[in-house]
From Swiss-Prot:
One of its GO terms (cellular component) is membrane. InterPro entries: DLT1. The chain crosses the membrane at residues 14-34, 44-64. The gene is DLT1. It comes from Eremothecium gossypii (strain ATCC 10895 / CBS 109.51 / FGSC 9923 / NRRL Y-1056). This is Defect at low temperature protein 1. Its main location: membrane.
Amino acid sequence: MGAVNIPTWARHSFATVLILLLLAFSLILPVDVIRRVSQMPHEILNTAIIVGAAITLLITFTSLSFGRLLVHRSCMQDIPKRYVPITERDLPNTRIRGEIYHKLEHCKQLAHDFSTPETRVVHAGLEPPAHVDHCGDDMLPPLLDYQACVKIIADRFKFQGILLNKYMLEPKLGMTFAAQLRRTVSENDCVDRNQLEEFITLYETIRYSGHPVTRGKFIRFMELCLLLVDFSLLTHRVDTPPSGEPSSTTDSATNFNAHVLYSRTEESISQSSA
């Protein structure tokens, strides 16, 4: 059997009449008690009976209200959490239901279109993983921590006198990175002072600004760092560390690369002067 559709005005009218009848029958008890007690000679007893009847009526109404609230909440808990009321029985209006279906399909299409960004998303401070977004440039390794990389470069130069694995000078403890760098290139006429100051400013901004390093600033910092190394190799011979032996296989390979770069630089200078 199909469900009977009752008009809204009929349901509201029936509910109003039912509530009025309930209130009328509920008021009969206190009115009758007050009338009977008023005919009795004892005033204290009359007052106690009236107050008791009023309290009993109040407790009854409160219990009914809380009971209805608890029943309503228990019924609401039976509804599935992921249930979306868009069926024909939930939305009898065909036009509204069709519009909702259309918007849901549109949202599904938008979610598919926006699942992959048009451009590579690079958050400040860290290079993205290799598998996210689309294949971008391979200039930097995945998950590279920009600030940690800058700190390692500065600490190696400050305490070991090594700039990008090229042994350059005897470090002087107690000097800042900027002072150490200015002292190193003070006698080098090939170094552009503006680029040196830009390099130092970038370093101090990256280390002490308190904000994550952007990819552009980090790349510019590395470009200037490589440029300073090339300038220093034009006038300073790359020597081995004071110990005379590399500390590891990595240091040995680094010194070999430094000598290769230095020899190439000398060849380029001789060719240009010829």
